[in-house]
């Protein structure tokens, strides 16, 4: 079900609500949510369209539920960032992006253009850094912020003004992280969530962490010592063990991992909150895009909703 009425409003929202979407990871989730139907999702030109379709469904669901006054979809600009300059193997070893997914990316951006949604990328930075920077700017300006991603890196940004939603299953199921929920689930604060990643590493991003420290051990250390810094301040008092030996040997690696895992909230972005006002789609061109993609049901729903609004 697609809720087109939700994005055909005229933007007259009383409350300032910012929706920030990690475009690359959400698109990837959309691709695999409909992967079993990959061959069914092709347009007349032979383009695979499952990621585009799934991304549209996710957007429609979020727009209807969040009702943002402002919105941005952030993308990664490329594989080279300030983090790869710091650690060449960062995100190394990832599997090749499927061609069926790669070919859809330009059309996801085109979809956003027709929907009237701003998208942005910044050389040398990741989508997370763009999101983190705008999140802090929006907090200072009195916004309520919803961040949506396909992975958990952005959980570190949750606070009293910011909810971080992680895509779980399909195109409409999300797990919402607030500071209270994070404490309830893991016993950690958002700042400690970064330290946990520094300790245990992250295989998906190829962040090394400390040898043989997993989630359970990492949480135990943080509950005892408060932070990564606290662990090393108290390490001399720890009883002799293989874990202590690994912590000592991998100290430099642990602090490098923390730097790699920490989102930059002061990225030199060239856009501001005033550029992110959402006032709805270009219905005519969005309809033409649906025709090109072969999205008959979406086109029909768009026509019905736009007629009702008119």
Stretches with model-predicted labels:
Residues 82-84, 156, 271:
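Generic domain-boundary/flexible-linker signal
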Residues 49-52, 102, 125, 254, ...:
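Electropositive phosphate-/nucleotide-binding environments in soluble metabolic enzymes
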Residues 13-118:
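Domain-level signal for Mg2+-assisted phosphodiester chemistry and nucleotide/NA-binding surfaces
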Residues 9, 15, 39-42, 92-269, ...:
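Extended two-metal-dependent nuclease catalytic cores across DNA- and RNA-processing enzymes
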Residues 1-12:
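Short, Lys/Arg-enriched N-terminal segments with co-localized hydrophobic residues
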Residues 13-17, 246-250, 259-310:
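Low-complexity, acidic/Ser/Thr- and charged residue-rich accessory regions of DNA metabolism proteins
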Residues 29-30, 157, 299-300:
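Short helix/loop capping segments that flank catalytic or ligand/cofactor-binding pockets
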């Amino acid at each position: 079900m697609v809720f087109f009425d939700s994005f055909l409003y005229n933007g007259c929202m009383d409350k300032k609500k910012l929706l920030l979407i990690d475009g690359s990871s959400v698109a990837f989730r959309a691709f695999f949510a409909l992967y079993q139907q990959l061959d069914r999702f092709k347009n007349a030109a032979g383009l695979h369209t499952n990621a585009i379709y799934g991304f549209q469904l996710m957007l429609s669901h979020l727009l209807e539920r969040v009702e943002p006054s402002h919105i941005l979809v952030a993308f990664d600009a490329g594989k080279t960032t300030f983090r790869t300059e710091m650690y060449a193997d960062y995100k190394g070893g990832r599997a090749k992006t499927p061609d069926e997914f790669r070919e859809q990316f330009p059309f996801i951006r085109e979809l956003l253009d027709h929907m009237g949604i701003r998208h942005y990328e910044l050389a040398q930075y990741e989508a997370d850094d763009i999101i983190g920077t705008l999140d802090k700017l929006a907090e200072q300006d009195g916004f309520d912020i919803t961040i949506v991603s396909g992975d958990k890196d952005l959980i570190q940004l949750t606070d009293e003004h910011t909810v971080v939603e992680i895509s779980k299953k399909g195109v409409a199921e999300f797990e919402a992280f607030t500071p209270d929920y994070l404490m309830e689930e893991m016993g950690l604060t958002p700042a400690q969530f970064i330290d946990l990643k520094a300790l245990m590493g992250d295989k998906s991003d190829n962040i090394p962490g400390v040898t043989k420290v997993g989630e359970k051990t990492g949480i135990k250390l943080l509950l005892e010592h408060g932070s990564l810094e606290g662990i090393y301040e108290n390490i001399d008092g720890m009883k002799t063990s293989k874990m202590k030996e690994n912590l000592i040997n991998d100290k430099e690696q642990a602090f490098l991992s923390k730097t790699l895992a920490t989102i930059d909230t002061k990225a030199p972005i060239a856009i501001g909150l005033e550029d992110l006002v959402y006032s709805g789609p270009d219905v005519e061109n969005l309809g033409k895009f649906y025709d090109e993609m072969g999205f008959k049901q979406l086109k029909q729903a768009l026509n019905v909703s736009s007629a009702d609004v008119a």
